Amino acid sequence: MPNEPVLDQVDRLQRSSRDVTTLPAMMSQWLSTVLPGGATPEITVESGIDSTGMSSETIILTARWEEDGQPVAQKLVARVAPTAEDVQVFPTYRLDHQFDVIRKVGEITDVPVPRVRWLESTGEVLGTPFFLMDYVDGEVPPDVMPYTFGGNWFADAPVERQRELQDATVSVLASLHSIPDAESTFGFLADGQDGDSALRRHFNWVRSWYDFAVPDIGRSPLLERTFQWLEDNWPQEAAATEPVLLWGDARVGNVLYRDFHPVAVLDWEMVTLGPRELDVAWMIFAHMVFQELASLATLSGLPEVMREDDVRATYQRLTGVEIGDLHWFYVYSGVMWACVFMRTGARRVHFGETEKPDSVESLFYHSGLMKRLIGEDQ
């Protein structure tokens, strides 16, 4: 069938057309305006776009300068907003919001986040905004190829250690969701959004994200039916709860680990305010998607990881809060994953890696899962 998902080159994702050879000089000049004493550092680019993210550019570099007569060497990570020409995943990128959230989370919680250093919000230096944070050494369960495919440190670990990592990652959500009065502390995250609740505002944003994706890759009847399903089954009780700070892209692939424990929580592009069920469901659903990918590749994956009952029990033990039903939030997560696949698919078409598909739904590796969740036959 032309609209069935095909596991095609999941190991290849073109991310950016940026020429990193021009970056050292530009970064050195800009850093001289923010470093103590106006020092002009020597910049070495250690690596370009990393192997985990699919949205903002992640560039690792080392800056060397003198401070008070002493040599300083600091390894840094630049998170750079993509250009529109690179077919960005999201309609807009608020690097300033990400910077402020990471800084505040580091100040008021025990969640391990990198130290953020400097923000350039105008886009005048590199063409788009960026911020710099300290480099943190650690391991990430890979997205490419998906960790459920095996042959990586997480998939090959004993079940007990996998569970240890899972529980430690759920504890990140517990800490974030326990920040008091998140609406006040992080109210800037709701700037410019319309809706009578945090969830409604987020839902409206997701719908606009889908509308943003359509012109480059085509409409999805499945997603449009799913949007209607979400409206028809709106979770009134969850929507009425006090919003918490949501990490957004809450999954193991966005954490650096050492010895199976988080040392840096990364990728805050989807950070928002809303019901805690959204983060919890997203973390579980992300693993469901990777399980679907493994199934398409005729692999067993990791069925013991991120089981809902286990995640619920850990979360309740850590927070004292029993989360509500997650079914609606799984469906909602599926819509957002589809929007990501629409944009990464459009990006591959843009960079000549593949032909534009006859049906956008051939890009939805999780379409079978989505149909099951909304009660449609496959």
Give names to the regions the model predicted.
Residues 321, 325, 336-378:
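Helical subdomain adjoining the active site within ATP-dependent kinase catalytic cores
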Residues 266-271:
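Activation of the activation-loop gatekeeper triad in protein kinase-fold domains
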Residues 1-43:
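Juxta-kinase regulatory segment immediately upstream of eukaryotic protein kinase catalytic domains
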Residues 245-247, 252:
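Catalytic-loop of the protein kinase fold
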Residues 278-319, 333-351:
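Active-site activation/catalytic loop segments of kinase-like enzymes and analogous catalytic loops
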